[in-house]
Amino acid sequence: MALNVIKISRVSLVTNSVEPLVLPLTFFDLLWLKLNPIERVTFYKLTESSRDSFFSSILPKLEQSLSLVLSHFLPLSGHLKWNPQDPKPHIVIFPKDTVSLTVVESEADFSYISSKELRLETELRPLVPELQVSSDSASLLSLQITLFPNQGFSIGTTVHHVVMDGKTASKFHKSWAHICKHGTTPQDFDLPTVLDRTVINVPAGLEQKIFQLSSYISEEKDYARTLTLPPAKEIDNDVVRVTLELTEVDIEKLKERAKNESTRSDLHLSTFVVSYAYVLTCMVKSCGGDANRPVRFMYAADFRNRLDPPVPLTYFGNCVLPIDFNGYKATTFLGKDGYVNGVEILSDSVRGLGSRNIESIWEVYEDGTKNMKLDTQNVTVTGSNQFGIYGSDFGWGRPVKTDVMSLYKNNEFSMSARRDEIGGLEIGISLKKCEMNVFLSLFTSDFDIYK
């Protein structure tokens, strides 16, 4: 995709503060220190907007409201720092800190780029900006607005995962949209104003275990002491993405299928459980290869209400923990019982979260990382049908589409609520073409069989 860069600006936040703010990182933040950034692009259709009106009216509103919303999300304008004398990195926010905003223009077909159909990953990559990262400093937020003249625009967001989780990221996007449309701060979003790290009560010693795990991730001697991110998977021209939909009726049929195929009556048949199990089995089958290869899969659980005392809803930062499944082989999910096996595993996990402590959950994740083999197939779900990203209306209508752009790099698939139906899901998939063809065949044919 050819882009014409219009400008690169630095957006400052509105603040009366004169002193720098230093935020230590908690266990929940440090977990994501070496993960690739959260990348999302959200598309907005403009039916009657010329190029001139966009730059004279719409863009200034987006910029002004961005400056205002940053005052409620202070850490996003700061930087991640790791000084040689410090045992761990921290976030530093200076009153005059700014966020990078790139404005570009593209002649690409907006309808195609923002569709749910198969699209080349390389065609969408230019729509998200990169973070500035060095060994001792990293920006935390970078934004890009791409205008498709007389068609629409997109907002590309890249966030360092160390600063916030998906729940807080969705609040940022929706709050920015609300301020842009209404000119006022939203009153019902539980804005993340609590920066006090002492509200995170976890056992001592867990933070150090994160750094000890670094030697299993990279053989580089100084890997644990640098902010530089690990090399991302290369995205070739044979990587494609698609957005699939599960209607509320589809999900009910998945639940009925689980009931019919399982001998158990105690299953936790939530939308999340049955949908994840279905996508997981399709992904394992589409990968091919050795049936005895290891399969490792994960999801992130919100621990705000699971800590003692609970974390305030207005806390700014990460509070999710990866729930790891690393003792399985592909054969578990390949046969006719593959789907119900996945349902039972995930059901037991979700239902048992309340009785598990953080140490035991961490130990499973630690073991999975230490013992992961080169031929391990990794599958992780990102996003949630609770985030409500399609509710972010900047004043020109709700998004027509949103894509998580970090799927292929992180071996993820995305899950979110459907735009136009309560109870349904959108599933974002990014795979090589050969795997995608098999995956789509399985996803649709399996559904036909069990309808």
Swiss-Prot record:
Its EC number is 2.3.1.-. Keywords: Acyltransferase, Transferase. GO terms for molecular function: acyltransferase activity, transferring groups other than amino-acyl groups. The keyword Transferase applies. Transmembrane segments: none annotated. It comes from the Eukaryota. Induction: Up-regulated by high sucrose and by low phosphate stresses. It is an enzyme of class 2 (transferase). Pfam families: Transferase. The active site is at H161, D393. InterPro entries: CAT-like_dom_sf, Plant_metabolite_acyltrans. Belongs to the plant acyltransferase family. PANTHER family: PTHR31625. This is BAHD acyltransferase At3g29680.
